[in-house]
Swiss-Prot record:
Pfam families: Ribosomal_L23. It comes from the Bacteria. Belongs to the universal ribosomal protein uL23 family. Coiled coil: none annotated. This is Large ribosomal subunit protein uL23. One of the early assembly proteins it binds 23S rRNA. One of the proteins that surrounds the polypeptide exit tunnel on the outside of the ribosome. Forms the main docking site for trigger factor binding to the ribosome. Keywords: Ribonucleoprotein, Ribosomal protein, RNA-binding, rRNA-binding. GO terms for cellular component: ribonucleoprotein complex; ribosome. HAMAP family: Ribosomal_uL23_B. NCBIfam families: PRK05738.2-4, PRK05738.2-5.
Length: 101
């Protein structure tokens, strides 16, 4: 990789996804993140390993099309998003900063 292609990890991994399904996957060692739609699996893997100091086993990505919504001025669309489900080899990530309620 050249210096021009190296991205800041916080520009690749934007936020954890908080949902019922993502909570259920944590027990299996899988963590779900909202990521930059232009990033690929290799960039996501390097970013997660650097931010959380863990080893990544695999990554599954999901491209989600923005919903079509009615506005005051006609029809518009929300922006497209991308999610990454990251499976860890070992270890855990303290995403939410405390015990689950």
């Amino acid at each position: 990789m050249s210096a021009a292609t190296i991205k800041d990890p916080r520009d690749v991994v934007l936020a954890p996804v908080v949902s019922e399904k993502s909570y259920g996957l944590i027990d299996e060692g899988k963590y779900t993140f909202l990521v930059d739609p232009r990033s690929n699996k290799t960039e996501i893997k390097l970013a997660v390993e650097k931010i959380f100091s863990v080893k990544v086993e695999s990554i599954n990505t999901i491209n989600r099309a923005g919903k079509r919504k009615r506005t005051k001025f006609g029809w518009g669309t929300r922006k497209n998003t991308k999610r990454a489900i990251v499976t860890l080899k070992e270890g855990t990530i303290d995403i939410f900063g405390g015990p689950l309620a």
